[in-house]
Amino acid sequence: ASVDQGGISNDSVIVQEGTQNVAEVLQRDLKNTSDIYQSGWDNFASVDQSGLNNDAKINQSGIENVSEVTQSGFNDLADSYQSGYGHTSTITQSAASGFIGGLLSVASNSANHTQLGMNNTATTTQVGGGNVATVYQH
């Protein structure tokens, strides 16, 4: 497990059980939070956060699951839950180009991926504000 933090008041929790699980967190800027929980074998989780007040949660159990979250906006929420074998979840969230810092609340995006079973893939890309995405695969 690897955590690289810069900026102010960033918080990261990584809990891993099992064998050959990998978790990587890179946090910059202000008040970003990440929680990664992995159990099983050969799972990979990655969180890359910049911006302000972003929250990422990854929970994986099983074998060979991959979850990647990239957040570069404001007040974004990403939640990836995977159980089983061979799932891939990718969530990318960013503020709109030229976004004005005084409108932080407008940038709020939310993405939730839930994958059960085997070999599911989900990709969500959110740019701007007020976007909501929910993916459930079984």
What residue ranges belong to the model's regions?
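Low-complexity repeat regions of mature extracellularly deployed or surface/particle-associated proteins
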Residues: A1-H138
